[in-house]
Amino acid sequence: IPLRLVGSEMCIRDSKQAIQWMVADSEMELRAARLLTYQAAWNGDRGQDIKVDASMAKVYATEVATRVLDRSMQILGGMGMTHELPLERWYREMRIRRVGEGPSEVQRMVIARDLLSGKR
């Protein structure tokens, strides 16, 4: 994570607990998203139907990525919105990914139908 200067000190180090929590939350969410994705891939490799697993991974990973980008922009302040860093472009691209291959709401319908079908 790039560090931002606040006065004469780095933003993430030492007593900047709120920033540290944002970094920790981002890492935890990214790892969870990665695990959902790996589970879908693993089940697919075993020949299982992965429609629900893939929907869960897609919804969670894209929403986590959006939150992580938002936090990163918050941490970096005004620099997060400049063209000098790729964050603003990544944010736009991630927003598009949330609607590609079905928006998150459609993916949630796929998940809910499966859960409520009584087949699990």
Model-derived features with residue positions:
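Single conserved hydrophobic/aromatic residue that forms the stacking wall/gate
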Residues: 1-7, 11-12
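Charge-rich, acidic-biased intrinsically disordered regions
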Residues: 14-15, 19, 51-59, 80-96
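C-terminal helix-coil-helix/basic helical segment that borders enzyme active sites and/or dimer interfaces
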Residues: 27-60, 73-80
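Generic recognition of well-ordered alpha-helical segments
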Residues: 32, 39, 71, 95, ...
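Hydrophobic (often cysteine-bearing) scaffold residues that line and stabilize catalytic clefts
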Residues: 57, 65, 108
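Amphipathic alpha-helical coiled-coil segments
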Residues: 64-71
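Glycine-rich phosphate/cofactor-binding loops in nucleotide/flavin-utilizing enzymes
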Residues: 76-120
